Amino acid sequence: YRLHNNVKAHASLGSAIQNPTITEYYGYNARYIGNPNLQPEKSLGGDIGFLFETNDGRHSFDVTYFARNVKNAISSEVINFTTYASRAVNLEGKSKVKGVEVAYNGKITDALTTYANYTYTQTRDSKGAELARRPKHLANAGLAYQITEKLGADVNVSYTGKRMDTYYSPTYSTHKVKLPSYTLANLGVNYKVADSLTIYANLNNVFNKKYENVLGYGQEGRNVYVGLKGSF
């Protein structure tokens, strides 16, 4: 709903179902065991916010509050302390997720665009504990430059804040730990070969940052992806 020439209000309410992944159902090796008894996640939630735009429409700033309740939230647990084998499980009761997101989009010139966003999230399970591996702070920022009519390039920086996880010790005890925050930088270039065909190359994790999304499992270092994207 437009409140003013430069201000829009927006809101939504809805429910969603998220089925377990194939990996969660069937596992993928001896250390991640499938769980065929998993139930789908069911959530009910909504958001409300305001979008502010400049007169020329080249810059916008959005602030949104969101909240949802999740039933049967999918998490993981260790089932063998000797091999550290784990499996996906449904959490009991309802989990709560709420937070605020702010986002900026700008067109600096006809060829140069930029964006930035930040999300603050609070999570709690039915017992009041913070959900595992859900960062409170997430941020992204980037630039895209159309060098020529066919050639473009972009740069992106993303920040992931600290997350809670569970440490399983050789003595069969557990305790909560915080995974450290990390920042990644990525570069990309694309070339339009034809109206319906674009070739692209991405250099991800430019500075070869070592990080973990799950305690004990390192993620990819510096890597390159090259591909073709077509439209019909």
Language-model segments: residues:
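Extracellular loop and loop/strand-boundary signature of outer-membrane beta-barrel proteins
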Residues: 30-36, 85-90, 99-101, 124-130, ...
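Repeated loop/turn-to-beta-strand initiation elements of outer-membrane beta-barrel proteins
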Residues: 6-9, 56-61, 110-114, 149-154, ...
